[in-house]
Amino acid sequence: MSASVLDITDLKVSFDTPDGVVEAVKGVSFSIAPGECLGVVGESGSGKSQTFLAALGLLPHNGRAAGAVRFLGQDILGASPRILNSLRGHKVSFVFQDPLTALTPHLRIETQMMETLIQHLKMDKPAARARCVEWLERVRIPEAARRLRQYPHELSGGMRQRVMIAMAMMTDPSLLIADEPTTALDATVQAQVLDLMEDLRRDTNTAVALITHDMGVIARMAQRVVVMRRGEIVEQGPVGALFHEPKHDYTRMLLESVPRISSSRLGAERAPPQD
């Protein structure tokens, strides 16, 4: 049995474009252990999201991936659509940045939640609905049964993201991939959602890949961190060691761009340069 939930080795991702081949990810390697939160941090265009999309067969038609990806010991890079579909939304779940676009606007919350349970866990409708209510309560949504009958636009942004977390966790996944899960939320709601995700990770022993540009979120949530720039990993290691003794200039710039109350200037001029 594999000691890691996810093992990525020398993964390369490229895209065919009218101007030639663009290399988005250039041979990255890392792993995620059961119950661990791995932070993957870098500016926009660093390749962090493309790494996970490639690993799970979600690249667009012009994308290509090479290397090795093992999920629970099984090689899944290039696996058949049937195998990948059985994993996605079941053993591997996603939480995206904007829940309003991730949810289907013309379908009630219960329809969208129950579909996952009926398809992947083969539940009947009464059992699926009961599990939906249970998970909405677990993510601290009041009046859960009533909320199930509502449409996405009738919920606040924070409540919609809680629905997405419930949908992601209710199939008992081994891996949760959270791609900028709180960027679209205000600071107070962001803190509540991060606390919720941390509580669920501890309660369920689910591995979490937390993709973000925010080193403050990494410090709050992750045990280990991978720093990406221009499609490459420039540094990785335990969060405490990396924050206290960063080895790479880019990591230091990311850390220095985080506002500190004690700073006389917020350090925006030290933010990492955009490519």
For the regions a protein language model found, what residue spans apply to each?
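Short catalytic/signature loops enriched in Gly
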Residues: 3-4, 21, 142-148, 236-275
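Conserved ABC transporter NBD signature motif
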Residues: 64-75
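Conserved ABC ATPase "signature" region
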Residues: 74-75, 127-146, 255-256
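A short, proline-enriched helix->beta-strand linker immediately N-terminal to the Walker B motif
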Residues: 170-174
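Helical segment within the ABC ATPase nucleotide-binding domain
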Residues: 191-205, 216
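A short, surface-exposed alpha-helical micro-motif characterized by mixed small hydrophobic
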Residues: 218-220
